[in-house]
UniProtKB/Swiss-Prot annotation:
Function text: Catalyzes the formation of acetyl phosphate from acetate and ATP. Can also catalyze the reverse reaction.
Domain of life where this protein originates: Bacteria
GO MF term set: acetate kinase activity; ATP binding; magnesium ion binding
Keyword vocabulary terms for this entry: ATP-binding, Cytoplasm, Kinase, Magnesium, Metal-binding, Nucleotide-binding, Transferase
Protein name: Acetate kinase
Claim: Cytoplasm is one of the keywords in the record: yes
UniProt: Mg(2+) binding residues: N7, E385
Active site (record annotation): D147 (proton donor/acceptor)
PROSITE patterns in the cross-refs: ACETATE_KINASE_1, ACETATE_KINASE_2
Pfam families named among the record's database cross-references: Acetate_kinase
EC number, as in UniProt: 2.7.2.1
Amino acid sequence: MKVLVLNSGSSSLKYQFIDTDTEVALCKGVVDRIGLPGAFIRHQKNGQEIVKEQEINDHNVAIKLVLEMLTHEEAGIIHSMDEIDAIGHRVVHGGEYFSDAVIVNEEVKKAIRECIELAPLHNPANLMGIEACEKEIPGKPNVAVFDTAFHQTMPRYAYMYSLPYEVYEKYKIRKYGFHGTSHKYVAIKAAEYLRRPLEELKLITCHLGNGSSVCAIKYGKSVDTSMGFTPLAGLAMGTRSGTIDPAVILYLMEKEKMDVKQMNDFLNKKSGVLGISGVSSDFRDLEKAANEGNERAQLAIDMFCYRVKKYIGEYAAVLGGVDAIIFTAGIGENNALVRDKCLTDLEYMGVLYDRERNFNVEKGKVFEINKPESKVKVLIVPTNEELMIARETKRLLSK
């Protein structure tokens, strides 16, 4: 089966065309600056890259451009739209409606629309991507794969907030969790690597990137995760605050005369390691600054790693032990210093971490960074959300 995988953002559209039989991306690319000046498409096939600048007013035009590239004489990979078997879409928020991927119909679109207020930045764009495909590739099934779906197995006592129960009934305010597609993918890969059934394993997965979350996975099911009602909760992130005392928000709004929108921006775009360091949200810049003696950059790194470590301890308690700790995503896969700080002094948990292996990782594959005698495995697993979306699409349509 050949699946076009789409990740629609508010002003960008990332795509991969995946053959699910070989699990290879035949080509991939991004349409960027949709609706803005300087819009372009960057298309890659066999290591060759084409960049084309033109006016791209909306997601319909973006999808048309992607299809043009897929059928392009030299850069293309197919002769006609008939060779696209299905389209798999990343949808950020499925609320309580979806605990699995679904084939899109009017009812599904209505539910995605109803979750817009839970994910105002992402869901409208995800929906635009779906509707653009329905228009430009009629007759082909669209499948929605939700970031939140994997976490719908969390027990009630883990996902509820200790607010008056009526607030949950009225507004569905609860923990949802995100990065579910990534957490699920790396858990499956880890089980394959360990040659043990996923249903027997207790795993802690750390998806560390510009947005970061940790997940406790017991016997293949998510039982807790660090993000909450929105992706703002949990770890300190690139520009997001992570969990703070809610009273701080009220105090600051009063002191600084901030309205809700300003506070939202403050917490989502100006906080995290950027806010602490005053340097950058990028860990490469932070490390460089810290090495040059910038104390705030060092503090930002220390705070980030401290929180990851706290969640590892917390989730080991929740799971009643742990078989493997997994690091993935941009920082998790590539930043040895961060992993080092997160894994030091965990011997009491049975984690015997191999520092030398951590700083000499073989990229692009599952890599073990624990000592042979360690009770707990520590793995670096490259994530592949697009492949997971393609797999989910195939699974649903093969039923």
